[in-house]
Amino acid sequence: MKNCKVCIVTGASRGLGRGIALVLARDEGCRVYATARNGDALKALVEEAATGTRGGTVNACVLDQSDDAAVQAFVEQVRTKESQVNLLVNSAYAGLIAIKPHFGKPFWERPLSVFDASLNIGLRSAYVMSALVAPLMVKNKAGLIVQISSFGGVNYLFDVGYGVGKAGLDRLTADMAAELNPYDVHAVTLYPGGAVTEIAAFPGGETPVFTGRAVAALLNKATKEDLARMNGKVAQTAELAVNYGFTDVSGDMPKGPFAGVDAAKQCREAMSKPLIQYDMDAELPDASATNNPDIAAMFPGA
């Protein structure tokens, strides 16, 4: 399809990235360049996306995002094939696999590599990909960049490096939006709820398809006015589901303690308050609530 929208989705071999790429191609008819290191997993994604009837496709692109030269070569390949990129979704993240063996330990008892895992393939990789894709969007004065982040950007969650990485993504979006705004290119941070993926098993959590439908809503249902309001800001999957009328694969909304409308409301309330580092009267969170050995059970695939 010549007129279909062109999307790049990183971290697409599994988890939320896979669900996002699948929905965009299979259900929305987009041409998706899906990146990951696992070529076999990408091949399976290509085959599943081909079952759709909208004419969308997934192009499997084996890519190590720690290799800047390889990322640049990938973007150049896309640039030679496409006149535009409508959407970039930065979903690649390597932190949870590194964090899992160390639940219950403070940061000074964890290997330094745990911190690097959260920031290198996550925050830094999102910056690199965005910096390389943005010129094409700026040239066309159109485009949307979505960073997949989490509530860890607002409050303590799991690990020091996890929170620093997610807070960094949120600020990355805000500052990029400020520089992109004159060119009608938008940047939005997306908070999924607790999810059920190959790695995570949050009770009552949302599926990767639900996250994919949230991204699709930003791409195809949000108006220019909607995107202008969300530009540089944090949107939540459950909020988008209410606003744009979609559900999870079950036909219902996720209803777990970490996902769904109620969880999103609690998160929004937390976001409305000053961050603890700026509020001298704020109480520090109890780190042990989400950094304990029992939490590791929520990540059986890590």
Which sequence ranges carry the predicted segments?
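Conserved glycine-rich Rossmann-like NAD(P)H-binding loop of the short-chain dehydrogenase/reductase
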Residues: 28-45
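A short, exposed helix-loop element centered on a Lys and neighboring polar residues
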Residues: 130-131, 174
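C-terminal helical subdomain
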Residues: 189-190, 201-300
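Catalytic loop of short-chain dehydrogenase/reductase
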Residues: 94-95, 106-114, 118, 144-182, ...
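Active-site loop of short-chain dehydrogenase/reductase
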Residues: 4-5, 55, 83-85, 137-150, ...
